[in-house]
Amino acid sequence: MPTKAVRAPRALTGPTNWTGFYAGGFAGAAAGRTDIQFVGTPFPDAGNKPWVLGGLGGIELGYNRQFGNNWVLGVEGDIGAGNVHGGRTAGTADGVNAKGENVTFAPALFTVEDKTNWMATVAGRVGYSWGRTLFYGKGGVAIEDSSTTANCIYGATGQSSDVHRPCRNQAGIEKEDRFSTPSYTRVGWTIGFGTEFDLGKNWSAKAEYDFLSFGRHTALASDGTTFLTDRSDISQVKLGVNYRFAPGAVGPKF
């Protein structure tokens, strides 16, 4: 006796339901500009603003709630580590002088460097779901861990070279050729936008741009006397993959 064949469910083609928790990872690049100064003896030109560039990768966790009109509200936290750094010749700094003998100390010539170890954000998201694609904007709090260095490269004869030379600090004490701060954590703000596409089986791929701004931070340098300040603005471009812990589409049709 013949039996009736059972039809297999059709492939999911309905609009995505983004409601639920999700977790994933991302990779990308970060670039920006910093502003490094000695407290009390600022650099007189713009050479103290090195560009920084590097790769980063990290993880993210969030929650979305989709409403009947296709608007999506959510919150997301992420953290990414990398090697985002840069440096340049900064010019001279009055009051921080080059080592020499029987000479009038000229202002020391410096290179300045900035290095970011990791960045994290906690942000609210507002998006709109169009079929299987989510378009969204975000804004919230940004955190970074970074360090700052100023290298003295000016010789006693007043001729510059790429060899680091000892300097006299603001207290007139001869110290090493490098003024560096320990790594420090500071808080700023972030805004961004992106798009996410449902790949099926609760997986999705995303592309995102974020702008992070961190206000000026002051830290005691390694000589124990001199203070360095630093502020930075960073742009991130990230590609990522997420897994949603909830049904990804309206459902199969039989």
At which residue positions do the language-model features occur?
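Gram-negative outer-membrane beta-barrel domains
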Residues: M1-F254
